[in-house]
């Protein structure tokens, strides 16, 4: 056994051969040098160029350096030419061995490893290890001790400084294999957050403050030492980035965003009116300013119009936003008139009465503006409707004339004509009711404000002329339809005609007429009689309303006009001939000429109504 052992030691010292030793079933790499002794194990040795053999070595203790101990000198025996790894020194693998995931073997850290020497390439050693956390903390504390104090009480960090930098490296070098940092293969210049202030510069101080036992945040005392002047700590970064945030101590108009979300006051509902700047939009209003905003809008319950604190209307008289609803236009004509019983009561304060009268006048002025706007819209609709009614022709030529309308060309739009007439008549009735109320109370001031000026009067007359033209065209179609019926009644019944012959004889048809569940047949002449009666009644009613509106303010109220305006449409009788003449007294030249032209159109339309009525009666009597 001694001979074999000596032979093994001599072979390892001379050739530096590598042996693969299987200890307890686990394969490990060992290099046996001269004078070294191995524990008692059974192992197989493979030598270069020689046969393998089995041998058993029994010794009490090995003389080779163990992994858990380190010799006092890098090389225990100068005579023994052993590798550094066998002596227990920790070193980093070179770039080539590390990239191939192989073991890097070298005699010392400055020499070339065995694999690079065999391959004939340059061996680039890697750094020993990363800087330890204890060394980083100690260096940071030394830098912080040199920086000036920022003020306030600070807590000192207790760092163990018993070991120097070399001792620290030596301490970790013994157990380098078992440290988690040994698994990381990173250069030393890549500092992954060893400096506490490097990763917290962008964090608000309220988020980095320590929490108390009950979850409260203690921000009065910093938890760590102050950073040096050339480094930005979390507190300095927070002061720099949040220094522009408005504070309530500096200005009452700015908002304090440094407060928690639960301490921020909600924005008032009326704050959207103030848009002076972005800072004012983001800041709460003072109490006195919010009080002024609440007083800006005050609704008058009697009239439903928004008023200011002084009692005057805060709205402008222009634009479509001030349009009154139909219920306001059709209100009681005595809504603005003072009560007769109130005149017998003693007068109150003259200032209150003046404010009340001013508010009433403003309301009347707004009503007049709304009337003019509605008259303009109605005038446009009436003009378009007049152009949509086809002219009377022969055969099927009338179909092309009504191609631009939304209704069928075979059916006259009588229903749309009556709808627009009702809309126009309702608007004139509202104006006449206000005028009649002012005349009955002898309120000349209110009457002067409600009286229409010359452009408004021409607008009323223009709409009336469009209606008369529409009635005239419809009556011409009914007349032609009745004449054809009369001729067919002599030759035979109209029910015997087929569709082609009926369409050629009647290029236009009248709409259906129904009373509840009863519907009048389209071939009946009763339908023509009813339509002519409605047209005549509408013309008479509109004539009386226009005469009331066109009457000057100083003209006394005539009995016929006032009764017509108050009681509604008159009976179907002959139109009074002096109504328009009386209405023309005191008017301008343009209004007088327009009224004279309208009288001629009225006479022509009424004559046509009477002609159609006689034809319808003849058709009924057949």
Swiss-Prot record:
Induction: Expression is under the control of the developmental and secondary metabolism regulators laeA and veA. Transmembrane segments: none annotated. Disruption phenotype: Results in silencing of the fumagillin gene cluster and elimination of fumagillin biosynthesis. Signal peptide: none annotated. It is found in: Nucleus. The keyword Nucleus applies. InterPro entries: Zn2-C6_fun-type_DNA-bd_sf, Zn2Cys6_DnaBD. Gene3D superfamilies: Zn(2)-C6 fungal-type DNA-binding domain. Keywords: DNA-binding, Metal-binding, Nucleus, Transcription, Transcription regulation, Zinc. One of its GO terms (molecular function) is zinc ion binding. Its main location: nucleus. Fumagillin and its derivatives have been intensely studied for their potential use in the treatment of amebiasis, microsporidiosis and rheumatoid arthritis. They have also interesting antiangiogenic properties by the irreversible inhibition of human type 2 methionine aminopeptidase (METAP2). Residues 556-571 have a biased composition (Low complexity). Residues 148-167, 217-226, 347-360 have a biased composition (Polar residues). PROSITE patterns: ZN2_CY6_FUNGAL_1 (PS00463), ZN2_CY6_FUNGAL_2 (PS50048). Residues 127-175, 206-248, 299-360, 556-585 are annotated as: Disordered. It comes from the Eukaryota. SUPFAM superfamilies: Zn2/Cys6 DNA-binding domain. GO terms for cellular component: nucleus. Residues 94-123 bind DNA. CDD domains: GAL4. GO terms for biological process: fumagillin biosynthetic process; positive regulation of fumagillin biosynthetic process; positive regulation of pseurotin A biosynthetic process; pseurotin A biosynthetic process. Transcription factor that regulates the expression of the gene clusters that mediate the biosynthesis of pseurotin and fumagillin. This is C6 finger transcription factor fumR. It comes from Aspergillus fumigatus (strain ATCC MYA-4609 / CBS 101355 / FGSC A1100 / Af293) (Neosartorya fumigata). The gene is fumR.
């Amino acid at each position: 056994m001694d001979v074999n052992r000596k032979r093994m030691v001599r072979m390892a010292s001379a050739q530096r051969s590598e042996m693969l030793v299987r200890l307890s079933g686990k394969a490990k790499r060992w290099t046996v040098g001269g004078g070294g002794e191995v524990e008692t194990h059974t192992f197989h040795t493979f030598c270069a160029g020689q046969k393998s053999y089995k041998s058993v070595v029994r010794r009490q203790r090995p003389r080779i350096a163990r992994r858990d101990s380190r010799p006092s000198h890098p090389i225990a025996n100068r005579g023994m030419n052993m590798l550094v790894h066998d002596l227990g020194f920790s070193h980093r693998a070179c770039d080539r061995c590390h990239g191939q995931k192989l073991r890097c073997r070298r005699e010392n850290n400055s020499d070339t490893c065995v694999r690079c020497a065999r391959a004939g390439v340059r061996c680039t050693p890697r750094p020993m290890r990363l800087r330890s956390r204890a060394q980083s903390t100690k260096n940071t504390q030394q830098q912080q001790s040199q920086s000036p104090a920022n003020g306030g009480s600070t807590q000192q960090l207790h760092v163990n400084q018993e070991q120097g930098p070399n001792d620290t490296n030596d301490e970790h070098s013994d157990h380098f294999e078992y440290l988690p940092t040994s698994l990381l293969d990173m250069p030393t210049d890549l500092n992954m957050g060893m400096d506490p202030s490097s990763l917290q510069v962008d964090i608000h101080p309220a988020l980095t403050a320590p929490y108390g036992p009950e979850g409260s945040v203690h921000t009065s005392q910093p938890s760590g030492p102050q950073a040096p002047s050339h480094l930005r700590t979390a507190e300095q970064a927070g002061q720099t980035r949040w220094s522009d945030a408005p504070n309530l101590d500096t200005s009452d108009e700015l908002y304090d965003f440094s407060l928690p979300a639960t301490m921020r006051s909600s924005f008032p509902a009326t704050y959207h009116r103030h848009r002076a700047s972005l800072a004012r939009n983001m800041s709460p209003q003072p109490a006195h300013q919010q009080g002024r905003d609440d007083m800006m809008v005050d609704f008058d319950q009697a009239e439903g119009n928004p008023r200011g604190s002084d009692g005057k209307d805060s709205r402008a008289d222009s634009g479509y936003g001030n349009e009154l609803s139909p219920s306001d236009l059709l209100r009681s004509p005595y809504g603005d008139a003072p009560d007769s019983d109130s005149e017998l009561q003693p007068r109150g304060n003259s200032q209150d009465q003046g404010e009340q009268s001013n508010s009433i006048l403003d309301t009347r002025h707004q009503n007049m503006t709304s009337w003019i706007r509605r008259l303009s819209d109605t005038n446009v609709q009436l003009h378009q409707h007049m152009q949509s009614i086809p002219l009377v022709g022969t055969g099927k030529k009338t179909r092309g004339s009504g191609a631009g309308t939304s209704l069928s060309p075979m059916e006259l739009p009588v229903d749309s004509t009556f709808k627009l007439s009702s809309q126009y008549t309702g608007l004139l009735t509202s104006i006449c009711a206000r005028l009649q109320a002012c005349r009955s109370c002898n309120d000349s001031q209110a009457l002067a404000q409600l009286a229409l000026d010359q452009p408004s009067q021409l607008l009323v007359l223009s709409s009336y002329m469009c209606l008369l033209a529409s009635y005239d065209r419809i009556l011409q179609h009914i007349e032609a339809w009745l004449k054809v019926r009369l001729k067919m009644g002599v030759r035979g019944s109209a029910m015997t005609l087929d569709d082609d012959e009926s369409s050629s004889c009647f290029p236009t048809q009248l709409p259906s007429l129904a009373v509840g569940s009863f519907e009048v047949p389209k071939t009946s002449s009763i339908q023509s009689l009813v339509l002519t009666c409605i047209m005549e009644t509408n013309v008479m009613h509109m004539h009386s309303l226009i005469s009331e509106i066109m009457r000057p303010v100083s003209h006394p109220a005539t009995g016929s006009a006032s009764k017509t305006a108050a009681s509604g449409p008159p009976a179907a009788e002959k139109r009074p001939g002096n109504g328009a003449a009386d209405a023309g007294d005191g008017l301008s030249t343009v209004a007088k000429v327009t009224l004279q032209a309208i009288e001629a159109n009225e006479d022509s339309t009424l004559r046509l109504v009477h002609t159609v009525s006689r034809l319808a009666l003849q058709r009924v009597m057949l």
